[in-house]
């Protein structure tokens, strides 16, 4: 009972922080994504270390932060406070490009038994955590000339609706296992229940935002389907590392990757979908 109370309270606080940061301003949204990036990359590199890999944590984190800052600066309304935006962006991009070959140079002095593993897991952390969070910077402005945080809020609600309905339907009538090797409790019934919940939320979002209904129904399907795969991918990493949770930052919920795994994998797909459809 105590664990349920802790989980519920921390979940409510987390939801309030996430939604509040998105709605408050571009800068609070950017700060939220930056915190998730650092926490998520730290957890991923810890999981990689438990599997016998030796990622270059500092280099990876710096590259991830630079990638994020470049993308956030590109979409920020207040970019003028950073000076010459074009020059700053060019310098940042050049620095990021130099960090990639720097990984190979650093590996020369680490004397690791498996340098390819060290370099590979370092780059994986950037691709798995930093890239999706960087792309999220664009979601509130894709298809619009102005910043609209409610688009991001709607995307979050679609992911949450998918999780809730998948859990409820799976617990009630779930019989056919979806991916027992990685997640024994996931069922096909829960998967389709989650899709239905996500589509319903997508329809509601379209009505509230006065947007194209069919476009949002498609977005909901894309977000929900890839979100489930995101959960399975994180389960794959945790199972290989022999741990239940990626971290303990959020009481009763685990770490950043445990709570935002669906967003990490779905964000690139949602970004591309919105770019071409919305």
Language model: regions and residue ranges:
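Interfacial loop-to-transmembrane junctions
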Residues: 240-262
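Juxtamembrane interface at the ends
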Residues: 166-167, 171-172, 235-243
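Juxtamembrane boundary at the C-terminal end of a transmembrane helix
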Residues: 272-278
């Amino acid at each position: 009972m105590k664990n349920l109370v802790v989980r519920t309270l921390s979940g409510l606080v987390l939801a309030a922080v996430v939604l509040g940061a998105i709605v408050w301003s571009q800068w609070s949204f950017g700060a939220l994504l930056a915190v998730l990036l650092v926490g998520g990359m730290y957890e991923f590199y810890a999981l990689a270390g438990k599997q016998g890999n030796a990622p270059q944590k500092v280099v990876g984190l710096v590259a991830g932060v630079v990638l994020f800052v470049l993308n956030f600066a590109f979409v920020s309304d207040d970019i003028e406070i950073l000076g010459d935006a074009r020059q700053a962006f060019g310098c940042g991009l050049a620095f990021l490009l130099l960090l990639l070959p720097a990984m190979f140079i650093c590996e020369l002095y680490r004397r690791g038994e498996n340098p390819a593993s060290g370099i590979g897991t370092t780059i994986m952390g950037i691709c798995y955590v930093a890239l999706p969070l960087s792309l999220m910077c664009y979601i509130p402005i894709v298809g619009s000339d102005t910043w609209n945080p409610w688009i991001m809020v709607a995307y979050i609600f679609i992911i949450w609706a998918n999780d809730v309905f998948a859990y409820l339907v799976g617990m009630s009538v779930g019989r056919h296992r979806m991916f027992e090797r990685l997640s024994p409790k996931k069922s096909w019934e829960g998967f389709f229940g989650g899709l239905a919940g996500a589509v319903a939320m997508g329809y509601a979002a379209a009505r509230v935002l006065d947007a194209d209904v069919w476009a949002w129904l498609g977005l909901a399907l894309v977000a929900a389907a890839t979100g489930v795969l995101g959960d399975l991918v994180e389960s794959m990493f945790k199972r290989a590392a022999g741990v239940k949770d990626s971290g303990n930052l959020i009481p009763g919920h685990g770490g950043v990757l445990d709570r935002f795994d669906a967003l990490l994998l779905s964000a690139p797909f949602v970004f591309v979908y919105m770019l071409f459809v919305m």
